[in-house]
């Protein structure tokens, strides 16, 4: 990763279908929030911020550095509120040319996936992982677009509507590195 890229982990959801906040769920004895933070760090992202909402105090208690946390006060409004809170917080940081947006419920997207997408960083980048041609996460957003995306982010669609308008969106094929599969229900985790 030549240009500095911030990591933005969205982990504020209540996990209604899951039966509780996914950030607190464990895979191989590790909470998903810590696994995702480690993955962002191993991919070379710095700084890394984690957006919290549901069970915020419990998630904060797990973080090795609570200053990484950004509270999305209106997290119940959906992923858009979390994305807005995270991008707004990153605006105050100097250095990163782009933000790599990662979701807490993607434990099988490893650092190699994240690093491959992050390698396309620039202030004007709009890129996302694809798995066998199907768009997925993480999503790389150049700093130039952060305020515009924060204004457009709403509901559970996050940046989806904004991304749909982009003719410059680059799909970065990662199907050889992972599946992009997410955790929707507890049964999606091994041993459940």
Where are these regions (language model features)?
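Conserved alpha/beta core of the MobA/IspD/sugar-nucleotide pyrophosphorylase nucleotidyltransferase superfamily
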Residues: 1-3, 151-192
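Nucleotide and nucleotide-moiety/phosphate-recognizing core
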Residues: 2-135, 143, 167-176
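Short, flexible loop segments at the rims of nucleotide/cofactor-binding pockets, characterized by
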Residues: 26-28, 148-151
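Short aromatic/basic micro-patch
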Residues: 108, 140, 182-183
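Internal, well-ordered alpha-helical segments in soluble enzyme and binding-protein domains
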Residues: 113, 145, 155-159
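Conserved nucleotide-sugar donor-binding
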Residues: 136-148, 186
């Amino acid at each position: 990763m030549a240009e500095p890229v911030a990591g933005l982990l969205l982990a504020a959801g209540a996990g209604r279908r899951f039966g509780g906040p996914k950030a607190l769920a464990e895979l191989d004895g590790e909470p998903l929030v810590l696994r995702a933070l480690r993955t962002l760090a191993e991919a070379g992202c710095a700084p890394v911020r984690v957006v919290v909402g549901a069970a915020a105090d419990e998630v904060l208690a797990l973080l090795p550095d609570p200053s990484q946390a950004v509270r999305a006060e209106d997290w119940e409004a959906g992923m858009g509120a979390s994305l807005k809170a995270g991008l707004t917080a990153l605006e105050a940081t100097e250095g990163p040319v782009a933000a790599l947006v990662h979701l807490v419920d993607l434990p099988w997207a490893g650092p190699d996936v994240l690093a491959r997408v992050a390698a396309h960083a620039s202030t004007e980048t709009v890129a996302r992982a694809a798995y066998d041609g199907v768009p997925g996460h993480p999503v790389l957003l150049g700093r130039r677009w952060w305020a515009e995306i924060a204004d457009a982010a709403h509901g559970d669609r996050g940046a989806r509507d904004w991304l749909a308008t982009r003719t410059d969106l680059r799909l970065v094929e990662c199907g050889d590195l992972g599946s992009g599969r997410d955790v929707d229900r507890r049964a999606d985790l091994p041993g459940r």
